[in-house]
A protein has these predicted regions:
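Histidine- and aromatic-rich ligand-binding microenvironments
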Residues: 5, 35-36, 93-94, 115
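A generic structural signal for short hydrophobic patches within well-formed alpha-helices
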Residues: 9-10, 40-43, 76, 118-119
Length: 131
């Protein structure tokens, strides 16, 4: 099971079918991909604050091929564990990424990202799609 983070979504929306995301999708075309709803929120917020970027509904339709991973009670608890571990290791990451890591780790998915800081999260399998 693979879940994408915000960097993947932004790159998908801006690549125009060519680039690292397109290559990744071509290599994994038979696998379903999941998007944490928190990552979707981050992308939707970008639309609201960008000039001429369309609407949240338009963006949601462009991303409807992704399965959703909701933020649940179990993922909330997992995110607290992630934050505690990162703090103990002296490697904090931003709050929203802690929550995304909690969602993904709780369901046992791999996180598809180009953000290196997710590698600091114990027991979170990170798959890089771009360097």
């Amino acid at each position: 099971m693979k879940a994408v983070d915000t960097t993947f979504l932004v790159d998908y929306l801006t690549e125009d079918g060519e680039g690292p995301v397109a290559e990744f999708l071509g290599a994994t075309e038979n696998e379903p991909l999941y998007a944490p709803t928190l990552a979707l929120n981050e992308v939707y917020r970008g639309v609201i604050f960008a000039d001429g970027a369309g609407t949240v509904d338009d963006l949601s339709r462009r991303l409807e091929w992704l399965e959703r991973l909701p933020f649940t009670e179990a993922s909330a608890r997992e995110a607290v564990a992630v934050e505690r571990e990162l703090k103990a290791d002296g490697e904090p990451i931003n709050r929203l990424d802690v929550l995304i890591a909690g969602v993904v780790r709780e369901v046992g998915a791999e996180l598809v990202t180009r953000d290196e800081h997710f590698r600091a999260v114990d027991s979170l399998e990170v798959v890089e799609y771009a360097e």
